[in-house]
Amino acid sequence: MSADGVFRDQGGFVTTTVDSFLRWAQSNSIWPLTFGLACCAIEMMNLASGPRYDIARFGSEAFRASPRQADLIFISGRVSNKMAPVIKRVYSQMLEPKWVVAFGACASSGGIFDNYAIMQGVDNLLPVDIYVPGCPPTPEAVIYAVQKLRDRIRKEDPRGGIIVRG
């Protein structure tokens, strides 16, 4: 039996259910899309292209430029009311199943910008699966968030936000 309980060894044969296998495959091949609206996007670039962090070992081989090729979207930065329809359109073009990570204090809660033009958290617009706090969050916190999302996909947990403390 594997550590996550997907595959079972029964006398030299490996057995599993189709649902368990598909959840295992989805959790090991997450294709992220970044939607950077402010300074946290710089930290995402550090994670995606820096030699220090190898995100390929977590199933995210490369960041996608098209929402039609992605199943995970990182929203980073403050979301203005003018940008909300664009984010909704990008989210609707993503493949099912799809997940949302609110990356940073501004995407999670609006940050310090409490005015009429800024949404107070992207969860007012999209169903957020993981909240990564920080200004900006560290790459380690993002890697931890992706690991938590992978665990959720494998266990088929219901939707609802997880706050990552990293």
Swiss-Prot record:
Gene Ontology molecular functions: 4 iron, 4 sulfur cluster binding; iron ion binding; NADH dehydrogenase (ubiquinone) activity; NADH:ubiquinone reductase (non-electrogenic) activity; quinone binding
Top EC class for this record: translocase
GO BP term (any one): electron transport coupled proton transport
Membrane keyword on record: yes
Top-level lineage group: Bacteria
InterPro entries in alphabetical order: NADH_UbQ_OxRdtase-like_20kDa, NADH_UQ_OxRdtase_20Kd_su
EC number: 7.1.1.-
Cofactor note: Binds 1 [4Fe-4S] cluster.
Positions with a binding annotation for [4Fe-4S] cluster: C39, C40, C106, C135
Topology of this chain in the membrane: Peripheral membrane protein
Catalytic activity: a quinone + NADH + 5 H(+)(in) = a quinol + NAD(+) + 4 H(+)(out)
Compartments where located: Cell membrane
Cofactor: [4Fe-4S] cluster
SUPFAM superfamilies in alphabetical order: HydA/Nqo6-like
Similarity remark: Belongs to the complex I 20 kDa subunit family.
PANTHER family xrefs: NADH DEHYDROGENASE, NADH DEHYDROGENASE [UBIQUINONE] IRON-SULFUR PROTEIN 7, MITOCHONDRIAL
Name recorded for this polypeptide: NADH-quinone oxidoreductase subunit B 1
Protein's organism: Symbiobacterium thermophilum (strain DSM 24528 / JCM 14929 / IAM 14863 / T)
